[in-house]
């Protein structure tokens, strides 16, 4: 375990140097890993584990997702099973179903958690809010987590490029004395570049805050506010979109990712530099109270309850689709669709 200084704070980090793939294979050589769910994280994690030489099976209900698993090379009756059968065969159960689905199938999973098995998560929601989800594992199994900091699609594509995605990890329950080794081996096996230590609660709180904040909710709100302001002041849709979204995603974000915002501030025009320095304070002051309110809503379980209650309503899917359609049909994103078509690589 390496100790890395992040901005003056030392954290425990596991890298491929400390825990190489060969060691991971040795740790898990007698294990059968069942990946439950072939939706968001399931395909990337299961295929990466398979390609890295681990003994992997998939548990998935019949339907379109089951058919997708077959297309990806999983063989019904050999490496692709019902959720119940996969749980029976596994020594490590990767519980990668959606939060709502985890609540639904938990009785089946729990019934097959015999002593010594490991229950693996990639998100701490079900455990952190187990007073609401009723996902309470027996005391004689390991309960562990590796949470990739990106989508399952990114996990797979970076793996195929010979790279890796960063992940957090946590040990909730070590019944066998092997929980940490199992966690490290699985993290390396799914293609993590490096792993930093956290807890189930902290992963859940930061993840839910991020999704509702800068990763999705806040950025959509911020982009829309600027786009609307430009449109209301006479700017055309294409100009408003290019100045709000296109320049951000195509020019600035790649540099932001490679070199950091501090580098961008030091390497832009003097006009942009002065304006950015002057206005970052007002934007910080305007949004900080919103983030504090959001974090409190996450930490108290309010956001979890909203999610659970919403998903349990019989008409939720219909209403959700209507919300998503409204977003899709909005002027800003219809403009974006045309702007993307006009990019040189798409012409």
Language-model regions, residue ranges each:
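Short glycine/serine/threonine-rich phosphate/pyrophosphate-binding segments
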Residues: 40-45, 64-67, 102-105, 128, ...
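Rossmann-fold NAD(P) dinucleotide-binding segment
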Residues: 82-135
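Rossmann-fold dinucleotide-binding core
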Residues: 120-212
């Amino acid at each position: 375990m390496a100790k890395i200084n992040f901005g003056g704070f030392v954290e425990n980090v596991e890298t491929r140097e400390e825990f190489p793939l060969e060691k991971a294979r040795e740790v898990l050589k007698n294990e059968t890993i069942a990946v439950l769910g072939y939706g968001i994280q399931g395909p990337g994690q299961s295929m990466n584990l398979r390609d890295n030489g681990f003994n992997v099976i998939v548990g998935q209900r019949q339907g379109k997702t089951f058919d997708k698993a077959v297309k990806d090379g999983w063989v019904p009756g050999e490496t692709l099973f019902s959720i119940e059968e996969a749980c029976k065969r596994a020594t490590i159960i990767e519980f990668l179903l959606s939060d709502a689905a985890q609540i639904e199938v938990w009785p089946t999973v729990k019934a097959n958690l015999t002593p010594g098995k490991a229950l693996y998560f990639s998100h701490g929601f079900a455990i952190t809010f187990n007073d609401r989800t009723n996902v309470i594992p027996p005391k004689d199994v390991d309960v562990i987590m590796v949470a990739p900091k990106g989508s399952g699609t990114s996990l797979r594509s970076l793996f195929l490029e010979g790279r890796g995605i960063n992940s957090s990890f946590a040990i909730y329950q070590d019944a066998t004395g092997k929980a940490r080794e199992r966690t490290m081996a699985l993290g390396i096996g799914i293609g993590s570049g490096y792993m930093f230590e956290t807890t189930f609660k902290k992963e859940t709180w930061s993840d839910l805050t991020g999704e509702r904040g800068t990763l999705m909710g806040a950025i959509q709100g911020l982009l829309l506010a600027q786009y609307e302001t430009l449109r209301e002041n006479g700017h055309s849709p294409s100009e408003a979109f290019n100045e709000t979204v296109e320049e951000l995603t195509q020019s600035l974000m790649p540099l932001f990712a490679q070199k950091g915002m501090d580098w961008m501030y030091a390497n832009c025009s003097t006009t942009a530099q002065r304006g950015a320095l002057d206005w970052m304070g007002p934007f910080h002051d305007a949004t900080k109270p919103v983030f504090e309110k959001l974090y409190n809503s996450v930490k108290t379980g309010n956001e979890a309850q909203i999610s659970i209650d919403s998903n349990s309503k019989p008409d939720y899917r219909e209403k959700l689709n209507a919300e998503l359609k409204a977003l899709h049909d909005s002027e800003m994103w219809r403009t974006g669709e045309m702007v993307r078509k006009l990019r040189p690589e798409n012409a």
